[in-house]
Regions:
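Hydrophobic, lipid-facing positions within transmembrane beta-strands of outer-membrane proteins
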Residues: 34-36, 66-72, 131-137, 203-207, ...
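Short glycine/proline- and aromatic-enriched beta-strand/turn motifs that initiate or cap beta-hairpins
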Residues: 19-75, 156, 226, 254
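Outer-membrane beta-barrel strand-turn architecture
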Residues: 76-80, 141-145, 213-215, 255
Length: 255
């Protein structure tokens, strides 16, 4: 029993010492112009075709999914207003869209899994998902004790992702717009899977702001837009370039 009590006392003493050391480190960092934040929030958006191709005749379905992100930030303030914000973020991106298209170039899995390229006219549905680790860096401007604006760049690495879908209620021209026609009524569909073609790297810009609601708690909003499409330039199956564009919001804890 004595050994258990002694062990508990040692553990409590160690915890208190570690807490005190952490508090001292944070105070020392604050004295040198450093701030720290832990963020968590949701993102809503999708992969937008830029420019909008004439083959897309209308969007009939859109599901932004539940995209979660968490981020740690360190801010270095050089004067009362200007600073530099660096971070490390884990994020999810995704969406489901359905559209009516005409002569849309793609590849479909026909027959016993054979992939055939051609042009599709009818309904097409796409399901995109990606998980990435991101390094953002931004310039920050402190408006007052409550508000902060920031804008900058980010680079990300996708470690998991998929891009799948199906077509139905239309017809497929094999090889070219005048190739052999294969009809797909509303009760029949063909699938596609381009997951293995997704780019690993992403770079883009972000702009947003935060507001201190309480002493340690803030709310924030941010627009993130990628400069790079989700497929590399060598991927010729889809002639349209798709760029991730997301609006993000959430809460953060300010140390």
């Amino acid at each position: 029993m004595k050994q258990i009590l002694l062990s508990l006392l040692c553990l409590l003493s160690f915890t208190a010492t570690a807490q005190e050391a952490r508090d001292k480190n944070i105070l020392a960092a604050l004295r040198h112009g450093w701030n720290f934040e832990l963020r968590a929030g949701l993102s809503m958006g999708g992969t937008a075709p830029i420019p909008m191709p004439r083959e897309i005749r209308g969007v009939e379905k859109y599901n932004p999914k539940l995209n979660v992100h968490v981020e740690g930030q360190a801010s270095k303030w050089f004067d009362p207003h200007w600073g530099l914000v660096m971070g490390l973020r884990m994020e999810q991106k995704g969406m489901v869209t359905g559209a009516r298209v005409k002569n849309y170039h793609t590849s479909l899995l026909l027959g016993e899994g054979a992939e055939v390229s051609g042009n599709w006219t009818g309904y097409v549905e796409s399901n995109y998902a990606a998980s990435s680790i991101v390094l953002p860096i931004s310039a920050a401007y402190k408006v007052n004790d409550h508000g902060k604006l920031q804008a900058g760049l980010y680079a990300g690495y996708r470690f998991d992702g998929s891009f799948t879908g199906h077509v139905t209620d239309g017809h497929f021209r094999m090889g070219s717009p005048v190739g052999e026609r294969v009809d797909f009524p509303a009760d029949k569909q063909a699938t596609y899977d381009f997951s293995g073609e997704l780019s690993r790297f992403e770079a883009g810009m972000q702009v947003g702001g935060s507001w201190r609601a309480y002493r340690h708690f803030l709310v924030y909003g941010e627009l993130r837009a990628s400069f790079t499409p989700i497929f590399p330039g060598s991927f010729a199956t889809l002639t349209t370039k798709l760029y991730p564009i997301y609006v993000c919001t959430g809460f953060s804890y300010h140390f």
